[in-house]
């Protein structure tokens, strides 16, 4: 069974610090492990969803993981002792509905493939939480990190947030509290940010290509967490051309120190792979070996595949490197045939930009408590925010009014009045009251009173309450 009593650093007393070298942080001894011996037991869950696609020519199509599966089998990774394969399960509607509210409903958008993809992440989590393996990697699709709590269709290839559904399952079944999600996809995970933005016990860290140059156009330093969770959202927008050197610098100098301070019970890697130099949708220069070293540094408990669309030139090699790294095996010989060390060398301008960005982030992180205090003083009893969300795959323009109940000493509810236009189901309006998973009876009752008040005032066709560790989702 998972040992919840140890901190992040304590649970990773053995921290990988380089290719084929392990340093014990308690003794300082450096070990040179046998390259054929897995240092960590690893569970693998595959769900390639060969029957699901957005279109025949879309990047998110059936054969996306075909070559990856072939590579893993040909390399004999499934024959290595301590690497076990698990079957995915079908995520149940109750768990999904404790995270998401759909317009007109979730059934209109969520297919069985989406439920099995989320179920693959859940199967990986179960394997770790039951103590059957040290770590697990869910190689599943469709992806999920652009899916927000409100769902008006597909956006950024995502419909439901598979990591969020997995974390909900872990909190509900195993009592996990403090969670860190480190998103290494090239696109900012605006959906994961949305789901966790008001939760001070979930740290979301995303380093991605600068949103001024890439979809979804978000993910900047001022997106620092909601008014009751300042410092809980860390967006690190990296310049096009960032390579292995830049990612390692961000990991060592910024991400790892923040994780040490946050002290999560568990670390999740949203393992997007479209930072790769060959990916057709982005402009970065990361290699398969760079991804493996990143995983080596992070020491995540669970990894869940997100993006990555260089189906033949990147994914087979990147996933091989990640598996070897998570298992504590040598990954030094994982090299893509198309790799050119001269062509894909990070420029000095990019390095200087990243140095400056890290310096700014260190100042902001150090000032987070003062920023949180100022935010609370300025918010009053109820904080509100008005903004729009666009669904690129379904053409829906969503308008949102969000409110957060501010308490001095606990996490309050947040509500969303969502109105969607131009979608296939016509205009949709939904009011959703999200009760925090940490809620006590007073908070829960306040939330229900507020939701009933909103219903009496009108303005939506549906009124929904989401109580993640209580009754689940229900209509008023």
Regions found by a protein language model. Name each.
Residues 24-476:
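HDAC/HDAC-like amidohydrolase catalytic core signature
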């Amino acid at each position: 069974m998972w040992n919840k009593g140890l901190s992040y650093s304590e649970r990773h007393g053995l921290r990988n610090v380089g290719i084929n070298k392990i340093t014990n942080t308690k003794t300082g001894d450096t070990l040179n492990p046998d390259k054929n011996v897995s240092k960590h037991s690893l569970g693998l869950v595959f769900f390639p969803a060969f029957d699901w696609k957005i279109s025949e020519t879309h990047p998110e199509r059936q054969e996306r993981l075909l070559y990856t599966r072939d590579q893993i089998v040909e390399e004999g990774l499934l024959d290595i002792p301590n690497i076990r394969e698990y079957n995915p399960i079908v995520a149940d509607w109750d768990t999904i509905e404790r995270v998401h509210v759909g317009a007109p409903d979730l059934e209109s958008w969520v297919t069985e493939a989406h439920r099995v993809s989320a179920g693959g992440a859940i199967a990986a989590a179960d394997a770790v939480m039951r103590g059957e393996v040290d770590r697990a990697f869910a190689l599943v699709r469709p992806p999920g990190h652009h899916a927000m709590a409100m769902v008006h269709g597909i956006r950024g290839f995502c419909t439901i947030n598979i990591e969020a559904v997995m974390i909900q399952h872990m909190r509900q079944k195993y009592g996990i509290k403090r969670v860190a999600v480190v998103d290494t996809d090239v696109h900012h995970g605006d959906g994961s940010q949305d789901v966790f933005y008001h939760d001070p016990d979930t740290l979301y860290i995303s380093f991605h290509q600068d949103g001024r140059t890439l979809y979804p156009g978000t993910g900047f330093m001022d997106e620092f967490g909601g008014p009751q969770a300042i410092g809980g959202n860390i967006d690190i927008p990296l310049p096009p051309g960032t390579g292995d050197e830049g990612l390692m610098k961000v990991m060592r100098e910024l991400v790892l120190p923040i994780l040490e301070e946050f002290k999560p019970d568990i670390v999740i890697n949203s393992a997007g792979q479209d930072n790769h130099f060959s990916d057709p949708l982005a402009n970065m220069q990361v290699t398969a070996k760079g991804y493996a070293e990143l995983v080596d540094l992070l020491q995540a408990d669970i990894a869940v595949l997100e993006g990555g669309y260089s189906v033949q030139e990147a994914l087979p090699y990147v996933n091989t490197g990640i598996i070897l790294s998570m298992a504590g095996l040598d990954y030094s010989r994982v090299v893509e045939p198309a790799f050119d060390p001269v062509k894909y060398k990070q420029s000095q301008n990019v390095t200087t930009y990243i140095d400056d960005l890290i310096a700014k982030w260190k100042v902001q992180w150090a000032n987070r408590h003062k920023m949180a205090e100022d935010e609370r003083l300025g918010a009053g009893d109820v904080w509100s925010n008005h903004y729009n969300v666009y669904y690129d795959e379904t053409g829906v323009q969503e308008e949102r009014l969000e409110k957060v109940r501010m308490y001095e000493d606990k996490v309050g509810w947040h509500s969303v009045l969502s109105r969607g236009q131009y979608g296939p189901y016509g205009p949709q309006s939904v009011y959703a009251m999200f009760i925090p998973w940490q809620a006590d009876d007073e908070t829960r009752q306040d939330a229900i009173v507020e939701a009933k008040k909103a219903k009496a005032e009108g303005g939506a066709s549906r009124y929904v309450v989401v109580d993640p560790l209580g009754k689940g989702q229900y209509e008023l």
